[in-house]
Amino acid sequence: MNSIEFPLLDRTTQNSVISTTPNDLSNWSRLSSLWPLLYGTSCCFIEFASLIGSRFDFDRYGLVPRSSPRQADLILTAGTVTMKMAPSLVRLYEQMPEPKYVIAMGACTITGGMFSTDSYSTVRGVDKLIPVDVYLPGCPPKPEAVIDAITKLRKKVSREIYEDRIWPQQESRCFTTNHKFHVGRSTHTGNYDQGLLYQSPSTSEIPSEIFFKYKSSVSSHELVN
């Protein structure tokens, strides 16, 4: 039995009878065997590596790190996500089987961190690419905070109704790389429409003919001087 939420045994009945529903049985089995795909890009991931040791022993939660997204039902993002890495992250998420969950670990993953103020190549929050279930703030978060986030995710899984989670996500998801919320169809290939790609404000409104003509004239002027 799992002591998180909703035990399978109905205590109003006799001890020889177990009363439950298929949905509760599915939730109980999934929350006890979350297999994470580790997507670490920066220093926050070093704190997560501490959980593998004997002091915290995250194996007791049924966590088995996987190297393939097709074998994982949880992706844990830690560190800065750049614009070039955004399609790869979306592709990994789309390759995970349903139901799947996301934990955003660290300030850089949640808001872009200190790189989001004047950087044109940093995604301002991973939730602009994939839906996030648990936010874990910190720079970096402590291993105890990671365990608390996993516990909260297990509680969420135990209360979940499978149909209510699957159908809304298949109809509309947020996929964009220009730091703005955009609801559209699912992207199963990791490719983006050209209209969603980020463009520099200095050249986005200039026609290509005028821009390249101006650039060539500047280059020739520098050569003359």
UniProtKB/Swiss-Prot annotation:
Cross-referenced SUPFAM superfamilies: HydA/Nqo6-like
Domain of life: Eukaryota
Matches recorded under Pfam families: Oxidored_q6 (PF01058)
InterPro entries: NADH_UbQ_OxRdtase-like_20kDa (IPR006137), NADH_UQ_OxRdtase_20Kd_su (IPR006138)
Gene Ontology, cellular component aspect: chloroplast thylakoid membrane; respiratory chain complex I
PROSITE patterns: COMPLEX1_20K
Keyword Transmembrane helix included in the entry's annotation: no
One Gene Ontology term from the biological process aspect of the record: electron transport coupled proton transport
The record's free-text note on cofactor binding: Binds 1 [4Fe-4S] cluster.
Positions of [4Fe-4S] cluster binding: C43, C44, C108, C139
The keyword Acetylation appears for this protein: no
Cofactor(s) needed for function: [4Fe-4S] cluster
Leading EC class: translocase
Family assignment from sequence similarity: Belongs to the complex I 20 kDa subunit family.
Biological function: NDH shuttles electrons from NAD(P)H:plastoquinone, via FMN and iron-sulfur (Fe-S) centers, to quinones in the photosynthetic chain and possibly in a chloroplast respiratory chain. The immediate electron acceptor for the enzyme in this species is believed to be plastoquinone. Couples the redox reaction to proton translocation, and thus conserves the redox energy in a proton gradient.
Subunit structure: NDH is composed of at least 16 different subunits, 5 of which are encoded in the nucleus.
Protein name, entry field: NAD(P)H-quinone oxidoreductase subunit K, chloroplastic
Organism of derivation: Platanus occidentalis
Protein's gene: ndhK
